[in-house]
Amino acid sequence: MKVLIVFAHHEPRSYNALLRDRAEAVLASAGHEVRLSDLYAMGFDPVAGPRDVGAAAGEGPVNLLLAQRDAAARGTFSEDIRREMEKVAWADFLLVVCPVWWFSVPAILKGWFDRVLAAGFAYDFGRIYDKGLLRGKRGMLCVTTGGPEALYHRDAPHGATLDQILWPVTDGTLHFCGLDVLPTFVAWSVFQAGDAGRAEYLVQLEQRLRALEQTAPLPGHGFTK
């Protein structure tokens, strides 16, 4: 299997980096091909705009969705986007490793979604969910939280489960583009987990990754037009 790891954390010595490294090692040892997009290390620009699609200044208002579709047809995406699109097209499996910030993912990762999972490449009019342009691929989030699992329930302070909080990413982004999305791996409350707890999360991640082929995706839904 060909796996693309998309990593979004500014600190190369972070626990997220340990999760990334363990994932890369486990997947490689299982015979999978692994590529990495380390967004901070790459200096990836998260700001989407006309320059992404070869639109010149002064040409008038740019509808980015339509411009992306045109760039996909003409092959005029900027070089940094083309490189990432090539990785996505190559991959069978997309593993996203990041912390949960502000009930979502880091801005640099959101920008990667905005720029790389572009119209005409990852989805199109009438080509979403089970008809998405990336159908046949699978994906999974691997995230860390600052707070414990007990905070993430309807009757708890956050008022929602983490699955509900991350729904815009798992369903509204990855599944929207056609991916079958596996259940999210969560390392809860990494600040308070202690060395033993953090070590156990690494073991649990390894077990999850070694069972990828046997893991059923989250319930999805189709698109009817």
Where do the language-model regions lie?
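Residues at the starts of beta-strands that form the adenosine-phosphate
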Residues: 2, 33, 138-139, 180-181
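Short, solvent-exposed loop/turn segments at secondary-structure junctions
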Residues: 104-105, 149-152
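Short, well-ordered beta-strand core segments
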Residues: 94, 139-140
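Glycine-rich phosphate/pyrophosphate-binding loop and the adjoining helix
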Residues: 152-225
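Short, conserved loop/helix-junction motifs that constitute active-site signature segments
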Residues: 131-136
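N-terminal beta1-alpha1-beta2 submodule of the flavodoxin-like/Rossmannoid cofactor-binding fold
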Residues: 1-121, 203-225
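A gly/proline- and charged-residue-enriched helix-loop-helix capping module
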Residues: 124-128
